[in-house]
Amino acid sequence: MFRGTSAITLDSKNRITIPTKYREELFADCQGKMVCTVDIQHPCLLLYPLPEWEEIELKLCNLSSMNPQERLLQQVILGNASDCEMDKNGRLLINGPLRQHASLEKNVMLVGQLKKFEIWHDTAWQSQMLQGISKIQSGEIELTERLLDLSL
């Protein structure tokens, strides 16, 4: 399970380094094989261990290619999916179109989301957090029944 945020860097060869605390689990669970794709709701990337990604692929495969909305989702998510394999030092190459989608430069945030990671430009992540907290505090975000039942 992946949680928390880690400030990492994109090196001159367009690689990120997965923090040490996650590497052992990733090598044990998926031999460091991962898949990265675009997030369709935010300017960030989604990075999945291969077994988690395979579950997503099955769900996408079950969508109808004859339904325009479902086909578009398949095209965007699958069309941007890129296999990534961690090297022994925990580095992953992020390809150009993916870097462009998330406007990645040197300073990057790796955000644990339990079964996957989000990869953000550092200032975009900070802005997202500030806006999100502000919307919650101001009541702009209506809490659903499920959220009201959540006790933190």
UniProtKB/Swiss-Prot annotation:
PANTHER family membership:
TRANSCRIPTIONAL REGULATOR MRAZ (PTHR34701:SF1)
- What gene is behind this protein? mraZ
Give the UniProt subcellular location, in the record's own words: Cytoplasm, Nucleoid
Where would one find coiled-coil regions in this protein?
Answer: none
User: Can you state the subunit structure given in the record?
Assistant: Forms oligomers.
| A Pfam family assignment | MraZ
Q: Which PROSITE patterns match?
A: SPOVT_ABRB
Name the InterPro entries on file.
MraZ (IPR003444), MraZ_C (IPR035644), MraZ_dom (IPR020603), MraZ_N (IPR035642), MraZ_sf (IPR038619), SpoVT-AbrB_dom (IPR007159), SpoVT-AbrB_sf (IPR037914)
Know the name of this protein? Transcriptional regulator MraZ
Query: What's a GO biological-process term for it?
Result: negative regulation of DNA-templated transcription initiation
Recite the UniProt keywords alphabetically: Cytoplasm, DNA-binding, Repeat, Transcription, Transcription regulation
Which molecular-function annotation in GO is an example for this chain? DNA-binding transcription factor activity
- Keyword Glycoprotein carried by entry: no
Principal subcellular localization: cytoplasm
List the GO cellular component terms: cytoplasm; nucleoid
Could you say which protein family the record assigns here?
Belongs to the MraZ family.
Domain (SpoVT-AbrB): residue spans on this chain: 5-52, 81-124
